[in-house]
């Protein structure tokens, strides 16, 4: 009987440990929720106290960027919408405006024969959702720009039967 009472006391001790562990876990969960709420309230209160600094005149930030002067003042960019891919019928890449930089000095690498350049911006293409955004970006950086208008293709209306016409040179002989 002593072994049975021992196991009962062990069971009771284990149940107490589980209850304490469950209570500790539930107690830990409540403060974390309160901590998140109080942190959010603290952050919300801080945004009300801050004030924005506004500057009326346009500031020149070129000394702060570290970009050489020749890459800023003498730069010309081309703003355009890319043409549709001729190999596919989709118009996926014709919705956004692209800005590409002019080609500066290039030379052929004598070892490998690759085209080399010292211009870090020559191979970079920027993408914009609107033409006005691209123009504003170019003006902000002091670049001169050329805008090429969007070319909308005119659909040619022809019937399916025109593909099999006998009097046109659309049919290809198989022999």
Curated annotation (Swiss-Prot):
BP term (GO), one: inflammatory response
Signal peptide boundaries: none
One matching Pfam family: NDUS4
Single annotated GO MF: NADH dehydrogenase (ubiquinone) activity
Sites bearing Phosphoserine, chain numbering: 173
Superkingdom classification of source: Eukaryota
Transit peptide: 1-42
Key word Nuclease present: no
Record's subcellular location: Mitochondrion inner membrane
Location of the region described as Disordered in the Swiss-Prot/TrEMBL record: 152-175
GO CC, alphabetical: mitochondrial inner membrane; mitochondrion; respiratory chain complex I
UniProt entry keywords in alphabetical sequence: Electron transport, Membrane, Mitochondrion, Mitochondrion inner membrane, Phosphoprotein, Respiratory chain, Transit peptide, Transport
InterPro entries in the cross-refs: NADH_UbQ_FeS_4_mit-like, NDUFS4-like_sf
Membrane topology term: Peripheral membrane protein
Similarity annotation: Belongs to the complex I NDUFS4 subunit family.
PANTHER family membership: NADH DEHYDROGENASE [UBIQUINONE] IRON-SULFUR PROTEIN 4, MITOCHONDRIAL (PTHR12219:SF28), NADH-UBIQUINONE OXIDOREDUCTASE (PTHR12219)
Function, in words: Accessory subunit of the mitochondrial membrane respiratory chain NADH dehydrogenase (Complex I), that is believed not to be involved in catalysis. Complex I functions in the transfer of electrons from NADH to the respiratory chain. The immediate electron acceptor for the enzyme is believed to be ubiquinone.
Subunit field text: Mammalian complex I is composed of 45 different subunits. This is a component of the iron-sulfur (IP) fragment of the enzyme. Interacts with BCAP31 and TOMM40; the interaction mediates its translocation to the mitochondria; the interaction with BCAP31 is direct.
Protein name stated in the entry: NADH dehydrogenase [ubiquinone] iron-sulfur protein 4, mitochondrial
Source taxonomy: Eukaryota, Metazoa, Chordata, Craniata, Vertebrata
């Amino acid at each position: 009987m002593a072994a049975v009472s021992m196991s009962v006391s062990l069971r009771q001790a284990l149940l107490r440990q589980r209850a304490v562990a469950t209570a500790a876990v539930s107690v830990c969960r409540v403060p974390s929720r309160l901590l998140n709420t109080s942190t959010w309230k603290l952050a919300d209160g801080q945004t009300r106290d801050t004030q924005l600094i506004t500057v009326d005149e346009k500031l020149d930030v070129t000394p702060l960027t570290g970009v050489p002067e020749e890459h800023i003042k003498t730069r010309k960019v081309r703003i355009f919408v890319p043409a549709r891919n001729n190999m596919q019928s989709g118009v996926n890449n014709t919705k956004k405006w692209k800005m590409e930089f002019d080609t500066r000095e290039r030379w052929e690498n004598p070892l490998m024969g690759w085209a080399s350049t010292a211009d870090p911006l020559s191979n970079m293409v920027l993408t914009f959702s609107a033409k006005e955004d691209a123009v504003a970006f170019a003006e902000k950086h002091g670049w001169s720009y050329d805008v090429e208008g969007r070319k909308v293709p005119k659909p040619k209306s022809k019937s399916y039967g025109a593909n099999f016409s006998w009097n046109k040179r659309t049919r290809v002989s198989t022999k």
